[in-house]
Amino acid sequence: MATYTTSDFKPGLKFMQDGEPCVIIENEFVKPGKGQAFTRTRIRKLISGKVLDVNFKSGTSVEAADVMDLNLTYSYKDEAFWYFMHPETFEQYSADAKAVGDAEKWLLDQADCIVTLWNGAPITITPPNFVELEVVETDPGLKGDTAGTGGKPATLSTGAVVKVPLFVQIGEVIKVDTRSGEYVSRVK
């Protein structure tokens, strides 16, 4: 099995920690004035979803995680599972609610997603960075009502709620950044 040293650490690197695959969210090399250098990392356990701060001594080795990231197309959802299909082999993968997590509110039919597999089963779903969704419910923006922050909540066709500018109306299609859940622009 492959191993990584602390000099190989970068955001997105996947490795094994306590028998569970983890991904590095951010890392920083620290060389204190006194003592041994170390790498301060923030990691997310891919199965449990926990975010931890872990320090590794300089030169420490970790085992590479045997995970695969596949580009799959979201097909449909039934009572318990979301189904994804490989666009070339037409092989289907089913993911449970734990694997889908917050990505559920950004999944559209036929959307290309990144599905992370461990031991052949999906453990995380990453939706596209940007999605275009229709506004199904929002308050009407009143002319001249700009004294506040200039935003209002809007419910989208998938059930997600995002803050949008006052000029956005019901029925309009907007572009949303799925990583932050923020409004980007209107779609013409």
Curated annotation (Swiss-Prot):
The modification N6-(3,6-diaminohexanoyl)-5-hydroxylysine is found at K34. GO terms for biological process: peptide biosynthetic process. It is found in: Cytoplasm. Its main location: cytoplasm. One of its GO terms (molecular function) is translation elongation factor activity. May be beta-lysylated on the epsilon-amino group of Lys-34 by the combined action of EpmA and EpmB, and then hydroxylated on the C5 position of the same residue by EpmC (if this protein is present). Lysylation is critical for the stimulatory effect of EF-P on peptide-bond formation. The lysylation moiety may extend toward the peptidyltransferase center and stabilize the terminal 3-CCA end of the tRNA. Hydroxylation of the C5 position on Lys-34 may allow additional potential stabilizing hydrogen-bond interactions with the P-tRNA. InterPro entries: Elong-fact-P_C (IPR015365), NA-bd_OB-fold (IPR012340), Rib_uL2_dom2 (IPR014722), Transl_elong_fac_P/YeiP (IPR020599), Transl_elong_KOW-like (IPR013185), Transl_elong_P/YeiP_cen (IPR001059), Transl_elong_P/YeiP_CS (IPR013852), Transl_elongation_fac_P (IPR011768). CDD domains: S1_EF-P_repeat_1, S1_EF-P_repeat_2. Pathway: Protein biosynthesis; polypeptide chain elongation. Keywords: Cytoplasm, Elongation factor, Hydroxylation, Protein biosynthesis. Involved in peptide bond synthesis. Alleviates ribosome stalling that occurs when 3 or more consecutive Pro residues or the sequence PPG is present in a protein, possibly by augmenting the peptidyl transferase activity of the ribosome. Modification of Lys-34 is required for alleviation. This is Elongation factor P. It comes from Histophilus somni (strain 2336) (Haemophilus somnus). The lineage of its organism: Bacteria, Pseudomonadati, Pseudomonadota, Gammaproteobacteria, Pasteurellales.
